[in-house]
Amino acid sequence: MTLPPPPSRLKPPRNTSSLSLRWRVMLLAMSMVAMVVVLMSVAVYAVVSRALYDDIDNQLHSRARLLIESGSLAADPGKAIEGTAYSDVNAMLVNPGRSIYTANQQGQTLPLGEAEKDVISGELLLSLRTANHQRILAVHLTNGSSLLISKSLAPTGQVLGRLGTVLLIVGGVGVAVAAIAGGMVARAGLRPVGRLTQAAERVARTDDLRPIPVFGSDELARLTEAFNMMLRALTESRERQARLVSDAGHELRTPLTSLRTNVELLMASQAPGAPRLPEEEMAGLRADVIAQIEELSTLVGDLVDLTRDEAGGVVYETVDMAEVVDRSLERVRRRRNDIEFDVNVVGWQVYGDAAGLARAVLNLLDNAAKWSPPGGRVGVRLTQTDPVHAELVVSDQGPGIPEAERRLVFERFYRSTAARAMPGSGLGLAIVKQVVLKHGGALRVEDTVPGGNPPGTSFYVMLPGRPLTPGGNGTAPVPAAQFDPDMRSAGSRADRRVIKNTETNGKSRSASKEL
């Protein structure tokens, strides 16, 4: 087994540092301007240099043409060549008899190379080249003579040198100006980013969620608006969290206080020398304690479900809503076997949170059963309304919900005056709303019998999905044994209608009729 190296030989992690965005923008501007300056300088230098050399070539050709066309080379070649000494060129005339006439500028000598010798020998008719800082033109004449003319490139080199100096200075100034301008632009452009940074640090340090002022409509302004949207969402989330904690504390305080009072009374009655409570009162206290514990358990469970949905991370899967309704009905019947359930469901698939959908349906059925009088009827319908939507309707024959309170029943911990005398946490319908909206659905509340006495309440839940057809793609049929033993399954999820559910000798009995 290979042992790890001793600690002294372990290499410490290298600290990687990066330039700030402002410096990167400034360096990018400098680099781009420098590249453009270099390219432009090279182009200008090449164009000017080519123009100067072309001008020298044109001057040499013009001087040679003038000497040849004037006839002075044939009449008096010596005088013609000497006349060039007063200009800025060097000249040489080589006759066939090898007589040579020359005229050079002071300190200059017309160089002879292989190209000029080839022209003199007649192998070449024309030669133009650069040698010894001179531009040399050699022309073979028709009479066998050869004319050589050269011009110094020193003045041209001086001009090009000054041009290079000017281009270097101008380019350097341009790069410096680009750096300064880039820094100013980066500073001005990144000012909103600085405000965002300060705001983020302020939020982390002080929990101050005030929005940032937005200026303009550019990308940084949109970034600021997005950050403000995040701040607003965070503010709403914290407000909901604070409201949930406050409401939960308020709702928990009442049963806890009552539970504490009853427990203290029971403990005091068991103390040595304390008067004994009648057995009936003891039984009542114990029943109250159990009821309060159940109420606390229900409240805590609802809170867990509520926070679970908000926290996210739930697993989405294909859910058979007919199966969900059947399982929820099975649980509700155990608690209320003195009411009838009128059920009519179709096979419908929803892609979503199976546990959340089951809890929402169970809460709707529990709410309907709670408000239904003994012998009442609860209607449960799941019907397809269009190719991609189905509607679940849960109706009861209870006292109904006033129209002014229908928006409030879905608020957390809201309980009407009539509901406060009944068990419940005030979170059931809030969970229903949260689950339905999370699945892209909609819900509303109406009277079961408008104008009736009592009017009853009907909850309408619209859920997106697809129909579940026997033998088609979708979830496999669930065996009928998993449901109410008295319920019979037809096909994958055939429509069924429960006619009556009555209590006989403490046991529930149901009769079903398949449609």
UniProtKB/Swiss-Prot annotation:
PROSITE patterns tied to this protein: HAMP, HIS_KIN
Keyword Kinase listed: yes
Q: Where are the transmembrane segments?
A: 25-45, 166-186
Instruction: Mention one GO molecular function.
Output: phosphoprotein phosphatase activity
Compartments where located? Cell membrane
Required co-factors = Mg(2+); Mn(2+)
Keyword annotations of the record: ATP-binding, Cell membrane, Hydrolase, Kinase, Magnesium, Manganese, Membrane, Nucleotide-binding, Phosphoprotein, Protein phosphatase, Stress response, Transferase, Transmembrane, Transmembrane helix, Two-component regulatory system, Virulence
Residue spans, topological domain Extracellular: 46-165
**Where does the UniProt annotation place the signal sequence?**
none
The record's annotation in InterPro entries points to: 2C_sensor_his_kinase, HAMP_dom, HATPase_C_sf, His_kinase_dom, HisK_dim/P_dom, HisK_dim/P_sf, Sig_transdc_His_kin-like_C
Q: Where is the Histidine kinase domain?
A: 247-467
Listed name of the protein: Signal transduction histidine-protein kinase/phosphatase MprB
Organism lineage reads as: Bacteria, Bacillati, Actinomycetota, Actinomycetes, Mycobacteriales
